[in-house]
Amino acid sequence: MIDCGVPISKIRKKLYKIRTLIVTHNHSDHINSKTYQTIRKQFPRIKTIGNYEVHQIHGVDIIANAGIEIKRGEIVYLPFEAPHDVLNYGYVWSVGGERIIYATDLWTMENAPEGPFDWFFIESNHDEKKIEQVMDKRAYGYDSWRAAKRHLSTQAAKGFYYTNRRNKDSKFIELHKSSKFY
């Protein structure tokens, strides 16, 4: 499982089947403190992987470092830096001969390991053209252009997908889509 920024009631049934929880970074939509505490108490067999900032606040079993592989059973995870406004990691791993990449809340994929990948779970937050249209406006109560620049655009996500996919059957699952600017 990756991240736990939701109430425990939304994920409890799934927790009986998992062995590893990866927490990408310290934002409340990625780690809900109550949910995490409940997982630690009620599901002690689940081992948590997170970066040192996540560890300092919440405590994890395995502290991830960019570029250093982490082995959990048959799976080897490779964390990489995913630039955001806090320390954030994306991850690459293989299962059943298929290579998977997961990255969200980042503005560039420049630190991602090279493909090819079979599965892409990556941020596809906004359409660059829509953001350009609101560049100098605060119509939504905040600087939407500045906020968007902290997130990967749909164009950048698709560019990464097309240049790093194994073949035309590689799957692209878009994450963190903006309801206003996608």
Where are these regions (language model features)?
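Conserved catalytic scaffold of divalent metal-dependent phosphoesterases
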Residues: 70-77, 84, 96-98, 107-108, ...
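Active-site metal-binding loops of divalent metal-dependent hydrolases
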Residues: 4-6, 26, 53, 82-83, ...
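Metallo-beta-lactamase
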Residues: 44-97
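Active-site metal-binding motif and surrounding structural segment of the metallo-beta-lactamase
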Residues: 7-50, 118
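Short, hydrophobic beta-strand segments that form beta-sheet elements in well-ordered domains
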Residues: 1-3, 18-21, 44-53, 62-63, ...
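Conserved beta-strand hairpin/beta-sheet module of binuclear metal-dependent hydrolase folds
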Residues: 1-14, 87-105, 118-119
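Short, charged/polar "capping" segments at the starts of alpha-helices
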Residues: 30, 52-59, 179-182
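Cap/insert and terminal regions of metallo-dependent hydrolase folds
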Residues: 114-182
